Amino acid sequence: MRYGVTMFMTDLTIGPAELARAVEERGFASLYLPEHTHIPVSRRTPPPTGDAELAEEYKRTLDPFVALAMAAAVTERLELGTGISLVAQRDPIVTAKEVATLDRCSGGRFVFGIGFGWNEDELADHGVA
C-alpha cells in the first residue's frame, strides 16, 4: 500500500519545497495540491463542508502548478499531482503546456488530477456556470 499527502497550501503554511522534502523523507509516495484561482468576495455557494462559513484556507491557496514545480525541483521520487485542477476554469492550451512542462521537468512524476469544482460563483467568474 502507498500513502500520500494532500494539503491546502497557502501563504500561511509550510512552503512547497520544505513540505515536499519532508513528505519524501518520511517515505510518503505522493503530494497533491488543490486549485482555486480565487474565491469571490460575494458568494452564494455554500461551503462543501456544510459549515456556515468557508474556511480561510480556500481564500489563500497557492497555484498548484507553481508550487508543484518547486516540489519537483527538490525531490527525486515523490509523485506530484493536482488534487484537483479545475479544468473548466482554465485555458486548455495553456493548461496542456503547463501539464506537459511539469511532467517533463519532474521526470515523469506528475499526475494530472482533474475535476469541475463546487464553487458556482468562482465558475461564473470564469464564464463557466
Role assignments for model-derived ranges:
Residues 65-73, 79-88:
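Structural motif corresponding to the early beta-alpha repeats
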Residues 2-15, 44, 87-129:
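Flexible, glycine-rich active-site loops centered on histidine and acidic residues
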Residues 55-59, 85-90:
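Glycine-rich "substrate-gating" loop/helix at the edge of Rossmann-like oxidoreductase active sites
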Residues 24-25, 68-77, 99, 103-110:
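Acidic (Asp/Glu)-rich catalytic clusters
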Residues 31, 80, 110-112:
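Hydrophobic residues within beta-strands of alpha/beta enzymes
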Residues 1-74:
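N-terminal beta1-alpha1-beta2 module of alpha/beta enzyme domains
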Residues 58-61, 74, 80, 119-126:
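Glycine-rich, flexible loop/turn motifs
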